[in-house]
Amino acid sequence: MKITVIGAGNVGSSVAYALILREIANEIVLVDINEDLLYAKELELTQSIAALNLNIDLLCTKDYTHTKNSDIVLFSAGFARKDGQSREELLQLNTSIMLDCAKKIKDFTEDPLFIILTNPVDFLLNTLYESGIFSSKKIIAMAGVLDNARFKYELAKKLNVKMSRVDTRLIGFHNDDMVLVKSYASVKNKNISEFLNEEEFEDLENEVKTGGAKVIKHLKTSAYLAPASACIRMLESIRSGEFLPMSVILHGEFGVQNKALGVMARLGLEGVIEIMKMDLSLQEKDKLEKSLIKYQYKGE
């Protein structure tokens, strides 16, 4: 499998490193405009391949001709979110970068699986869909797996249990309007309503929603290890067939038409295979509906 990673910053290089460790691709192309950064990353990554004695070809380059016939393209270029900055404020900054890169990829690969890792993922995915560069089922954005990991982590920490005993799901946008699906969340096969009252769940929601901001505050840059791990989980699901939360273009599901929204879905090299139907509670439906109206996905 050939995977191209666009952007050799913290997220992109972490993804490339994880691809090596998990042996997901036998050919990796890392693209960036910063030659010094590329040189350093190529040394680090190729020496990692040598240390692990793996049969993986890796190339770090500015030249998009080397991306030809990529099976998967992971877009992680653009500006990272700063302390106090919303994901929405990033949209204008990162839109032109993404569209330019997507057009260059299109010149050498007709219709790869294109996964957006750059924020704001949902709205960048909308823009990419509207551009018509790639088919709608082949464009996806990663965020739900990361948010769900934060949900699992915070719930396990709050209840002092192992994360492996916790099962969580969420849908919606990769921002403060995400919907943690309480009705599908369980600990040791028991719904979390048996462990948390409404106030405690609201506190948990806040911790999950501020997960990224907490990293930015203390690290002075956006998270990158957990996002890279979430991306790898998505790629490995292509083989496992498991449902994972991800932002996809909907065509009527959840009442959304031709817009990107985080849902539980199954992924293949051919794109989105299946979207999970979910029996949401009235409260969960109301939260989702309000967010759809807020972002003008629906009229009031």
Curated annotation (Swiss-Prot):
InterPro entries xrefs: L-lactate/malate_DH, Lactate/malate_DH_C, Lactate/malate_DH_N, Lactate_DH/Glyco_Ohase_4_C, NAD(P)-bd_dom_sf
Catalytic activity: (S)-malate + NAD(+) = oxaloacetate + NADH + H(+)
Amino acids binding NAD(+): 6-12, 94, 117-119
Keyword NAD belongs to the record: yes
List of residues binding substrate: 81, 87, 119, 150
PANTHER family hit by this protein: L-2-HYDROXYCARBOXYLATE DEHYDROGENASE (NAD(P)(+)), L-LACTATE DEHYDROGENASE
Name by which UniProt lists this protein: Probable malate dehydrogenase
Taxonomic lineage from the root: Bacteria, Pseudomonadati, Campylobacterota, Epsilonproteobacteria, Campylobacterales
Gene name linked to the record: mdh
